[in-house]
From Swiss-Prot:
This is Large ribosomal subunit protein bL20. InterPro entries: Ribosomal_bL20 (IPR005813), RIBOSOMAL_L20_CS (IPR049946), Ribosomal_protein_bL20_C (IPR035566). GO terms for molecular function: rRNA binding; structural constituent of ribosome. NCBIfam families: rplT_bact. It comes from the Bacteria. Binds directly to 23S ribosomal RNA and is necessary for the in vitro assembly process of the 50S ribosomal subunit. It is not involved in the protein synthesizing functions of that subunit. The keyword Transmembrane does not apply. HAMAP family: Ribosomal_bL20.
């Protein structure tokens, strides 16, 4: 039986990796082995950072809410506790947006939270 070489399969796989490596510097975009290493690392970073982005935005929102709440005389935890007791169902993304763009509206929320504590 004749030996078969993996010509088409290998060529297709290499082309796929080199296409993903387009725009990389030097051998990383021209040669398969460094391109493959770089692409695998890039895909790993992309997956990791998609998950980290969610955590980072939540941290940013909490920091903004905390700063605005402290300007109105409450800590973050007291403010969130007061909102929960008052039955206000706003997530942290919306609260942070209100804190940045509508100081008067945020002050009203703080007063509502203070009243329910």
């Amino acid at each position: 039986m004749a030996r078969t070489k993996p010509g088409k399969t290998t060529r297709a796989r290499h082309k796929k990796i080199l296409k993903l490596a387009k725009g990389y510097y030097g051998a990383r975009s021209k040669h398969f082995r460094p391109a493959n290493e770089t692409v695998m690392k890039a895909l790993f970073y992309a997956r990791r950072d998609r998950r980290q982005r969610k955590r980072n935005f939540r941290r940013l929102w909490i920091a903004r809410i905390n700063a605005a709440a402290r300007m109105n005389g409450l800590t973050y935890s007291q403010f969130i506790n007061g909102l929960n007791k008052a039955g206000v169902q706003l997530n942290r993304k919306v609260l942070a947006d209100i804190a940045v763009n509508d100081a008067a509206g945020f002050s009203a929320l703080v007063e509502k939270a203070k009243a329910s504590l």
